[in-house]
Structure formats: structure tokens, C-alpha cells
Amino acid sequence: MTNYLLEIGLEEIPAHLVTPSINQLAERMETFLKENRLEFDKIIKFSTPRRLAIIVEGLAEASEAIDEEVKGPSAKIAKDAQGNWSKAIQGFSRGQGATPDDLILKGDYYYAKKHIDGVKAEEILSKVGDEVIAKMTFSTYMKWGNNDFLFVRPIQWIVSLLEDKVVAFDLLDVTANRFSRGHRFLANVEVELKNANDYASKMPENFVLVDAEHRKAEISAQILALASENKWQVTLHKDLLEEVNNIVEYPTAFVGSFDPKYLSVPAEVLVTSMRDNQRYFEVYNQEGQLAPNFISVRNGNAENIENVVLGNEKVLVARLEDAEFFWKEDQKLKIEDLVAKLAKVTFHAKIGSITEHMARTKEIAAKLADIAGLTDEEKRDVARSAEIYKFDLLTGMVGEFDELQGVMGEKYALLAGENANVSAAIREHYMPTSAEGELPETKVGSVLAAADKIDSVLSFFNVGLIPSGSNDPYALRRAVQGLIRIIEKMNWHFDLSLFIDQFEGENHLEILDFVKARIQKLLLEKLDRHDIVEAAINSSNFDITNMMESAFVIDGHKLHEPFKPAIENVSRSINLVKKAKDIKEINPTLFEEDAEEALYNVVISLQNQWTYMPGEEKFRAIVHSLAPAIETFFESVMVMAEDLSVRDNRIALLSEVVALTSVMADFSLINTK
């Protein structure tokens, strides 16, 4: 067994592309080796902004030799009327390097036996350039030189070593060899690698920490040490740490500062300037207050670090000056004046202005407020917030720092005298901002956030701007996913189908399918039974909270003994009712068997309390009360009686069973085998 090193040296890769690129390289190499039957133990990944590298450990010296049988023509066409081999069979055997007489008849077909020799690892790996590297795909490409080759960034060098031997191949004008390169500034020289196994130890000697996880741990340790030394609190934000890790090859953390006068600007603005714009880690004092300092990481050593500190401080001060200016100037503006100007700001060319969007949102929010059971005071807050909630889009601060939309709206609203509920709703209506993002905390904010998302989806669908495939330029999938999470968190129960029917539009069925797909996705991230999820999202009314709850409740009982017979009895009822053309009213006087009366009594009893029962209680009632009564009914009663009135009455009884259970799920979609 041997080890193989492949390193692709590049111009600096954008930070957000480094990790997916190295993952793709490893995956493509794994696929390539398996397709070529070249066994290996594992693939180790290395990455920096300037290189993507893997080491394949435990690589076999050659691919496995195999004997295989290749299926050929049918025996029916193998020979002509005179018993001679047909052209079809001759062509097949020739293509397999055999004669017709060498073929084997198995059943109705002829097969050719074929022996495939093993191929040396070196020969297989010489194809890595064309079969692995050249086939990589990226969201962003670059083209260089006089060719049509595209890659994430121009390739500068390639290392290809099988133990101590170069596995040469050419890619454009680059020939794979044993020479890597050190840090661009600290060791800008060729680094000769004698052996593939020297990579992880040799590169740090040239100021390149190629192990991304080790480099990240080093960055974390340095930042925490500086924070401890200065008695600060610091959070190693996951995304920021990942980004910083992917812009450096040799990290050195340092401390910078800014004038405390800027602390008069809201902390969110300062943090945005540092964290989002400059990739700095903000720090807090022991009381949890933002300190006039930051920690950053340079791509290099500590030499002349004081100049680096000064340069970073200068850049930050320029941003903070702008922030302070906007903070002061925006406070001179009036909310009503800004709201009036929104009439001239386009929401979308096909949809209209932001003012029109806000008006529709206000109407939707009023109806949601009723569903949510808000007080009269809360309803007034919903109405007020819906009238003004986009005003901060026209402030200088949001114009400069668009990440602060909503955040600044809340602050400016409070300064203008709006109450806490209205102000918080302005900030919360953007929530959640990501798949797992924070949800609104207030009732008013939840209603406004949901209403804003509903109008966005309705509006874009109504003008035909519907997401397709992976294309979703208006983030409607994210909006719907956020809507689902808000509705579930707030435990709102309403039929979305009936709700959106109150508003204009012709694509409501498409919208419901779109929402249903998002519910399915959310559920399948946590549950492994597709059939249970499918059953829950196909309940008889489009109650999102009910769908989510039902899926988890049913899934929680799937291993219990009564689960299978209960589902089967309910499913049998559903299937019989589906076949019926006309459902009559139940007439208890037509009952002929005790089992009919018993099932009827169970149904009536459950109907009286069904609306108010939690999902867990509903399912227990189905399993322990309804299903046994259904089973006895089927054992004692011939549903398809000769007397049509009796038959119709029994179908009507089963239809009530279906109506009851389908509120929770379509149980006929659950697999019990």
C-alpha cells in the first residue's frame, strides 16, 4: 500500500469557495478511484486560499483484475435460417475480442467472457488531470491564457507524487511535478517534496499551514489568548472564523482599537462594520459592553505587525466616521416623510411600489391578528407597524449598511416615540434571515413577519415569477420556510388554502404545492419516514401547525404494537370511501349490527371534542378507540350489503371515520409492510 499526493496551486480562491472546492476534489478523486477499481483506505484533505490538496492513503499498487460477462444479442437473432452466425452476433463477438464460438448461451442471450487485467496505480493516476481536475465545477469560474479551459482560479502549479515518484501529466501549460510553493510573502520559493508523506510537515516550514482544521484551531487559540490577556470576552463566530481561516495560510492574530467616542453609535452598527465588513472579531468588557477594540488575523507572521494594526485601524475609522454621520443625520428625518417617499420606490417592476406592498401586508396582517387572538391594543400595533415598517430603507445608515435594515428601523422608531411593540415588529419582520435563523419573539412581530412573507409569495406567483429548479432570485423558498417556522412556533391553527382564497390571484394551487414542498423538506430534515411525512402533509385541511405536529406524533408511534393494525383499519376505510360515487347522510335507524352502532357512537363522541384535542391525544384516540371499533365493524359487517340503502349507510358511516382521521393525515399513504 502506498500514499499519493495531489496538490493544485492556484491564484487566491474566494474564501467562500475554498471549503466546497476541496470537498469536491476529494469526492471526485474517490469516485475516480472506485471507477478504476483502485482500492484505498482514506482520503485526507488540505486547503488554503492558494491550494487544494489531498493525500490518498493506503493506495493499492494496481487495480483489481476481474472476470466479467458481457451480455450480447438474443438467441433468437444469433443465427440465420441456415444455422450460420448472424451479423449481429459476429459484430458483438468481434467487439469483445472473441469469436462467436467463444460465446456462452445463458437462458435467452449470448454472453462473452472477458478478463480485464489490473492496471498499475501510476498509469491510472496519470489521468487525474483530465478525469478529476478538469471535470470540477464551480459557481464562479475564471478563464486565462489562449484556451477555453475554466477553473475557479488560474492554476499555477500541480504536485503529483506517488510516494517518492512523480506521476506526470499535463494540464494546459502546467506539468505535474514535485515542486510546491511556500507562502506568497514569507517564503515565495519552490518547495521540493521528496515524498508524498512529507507534505504536512514540510509546508509549515515554509509558512503554509495546509491542514485547514489545524489552522482554524491555531486562529481560535490565538484570538482567545489575546482576549484573555486583555480581560475581554469574545465570540468565535462560526461563519466568520471559517471565512478568516480561508483567507490566510499562516495566521497571526493582533489587537486593534478605535476612539471610544464611536461607542455612541449603536453597537449593531459597530459590530457590522467590524465583523461583516472588515472580518474583525468584536470584543466586550467583563460587563458585556462593547469595547473600543477588535481582534483581527493577518496572513503572515508578527514581523512589522504594528504597521498592520495601524492600517486596519485606519480603514475601520473611515467606516465608523460614515456610521456616526449617518446616525446623527438620520435622526433629523421624520418617519412619515420617509413612508411617503416609499411610493416612489419599486418593490418589483411587475408588482408595484413598496407602498402598495405594505398596504397589502397590512390587510393580510389584520386577518392574521384575528387568527392569532391578539388583543385590541396588539391589533392597533400590528396596523401601525404595517403602515411604517419599511421606512428605514430610505435612511442613510441602511443605504450604507443594508445588513442593518429593520435593526435601524427599530432604533429610529423608538427615538421617534413609537412604542416597543411597533418598533420591535419593524426589526422582527425580516426574521428569520436564514434556514435556522432566529424567529420573532413578539406576537406583533410574528404577525407582521408572516403577513409580509405571505404577500411576497402571493405577489410574485401572481405575476408568474415562480421559482424553478434551483433558481429562486427572490428568495421565496426562504420566505415560505420562515413562514412555516413562525406559524408552527406561534401555534396558529388555520387553513392556509381558505386564508389565501380571500386575496386576489390565480395561482393559489401552485402556491399551496410550493408551501407543501417546503413543509416536506423541513420534516424530512428531522424524520426518516417519507410515507409518514407524505400522509401528514396531505391532511384534509391545510393547517401547517397540524401537519407538522401530526408528522412527529405519528412517527413517534411507528414502533408501537398497535400502530400497524390501526393504520391498516383506517386505510381500509379510506379506500372503500374513495370508491363510493355518492355519500349519503348517516341514518342510525338503518343499523343492523351492534358493531355499526358501536362505531357510530365512537365517531360521535370523538367529533364533539376533536377540534380541541392535541395531536398526541388524537392519534391515541385513533389507535385505542376508533381503530378497534373499525376492526370489529369489518369483522361483523358486510359493507357491500345487497340492500343498497344499508350499503350506502355503511359507506356513510365510514366516510365520517375518514373525515375525522383525515384532519390529522391521509393514513392510506402510510406503508405498514
From Swiss-Prot:
GO CC annotation: cytosol
Recorded superkingdom: Bacteria
Subcellular location: Cytoplasm
Coiled coil regions, renumbered to chain: none
Keywords: Aminoacyl-tRNA synthetase, ATP-binding, Cytoplasm, Ligase, Nucleotide-binding, Protein biosynthesis
GO BP, one annotated term: glycyl-tRNA aminoacylation
Keyword DNA-binding among UniProt keywords: no
Reactions performed catalytically: tRNA(Gly) + glycine + ATP = glycyl-tRNA(Gly) + AMP + diphosphate
Family: Belongs to the class-II aminoacyl-tRNA synthetase family.
Source organism: Lactococcus lactis subsp. lactis (strain IL1403) (Streptococcus lactis)
Membrane-spanning residues: none
InterPro entries with a match to the protein in the record: Gly-tRNA-synth_bsu, Gly-tRNA-synth_heterodimer
A molecular-function term among this protein's GO annotations: glycine-tRNA ligase activity
Assembly information from the UniProt record: Tetramer of two alpha and two beta subunits.
Enzyme Commission numbers on file: 6.1.1.14
Protein encoded by which gene: glyS
Name of protein: Glycine--tRNA ligase beta subunit
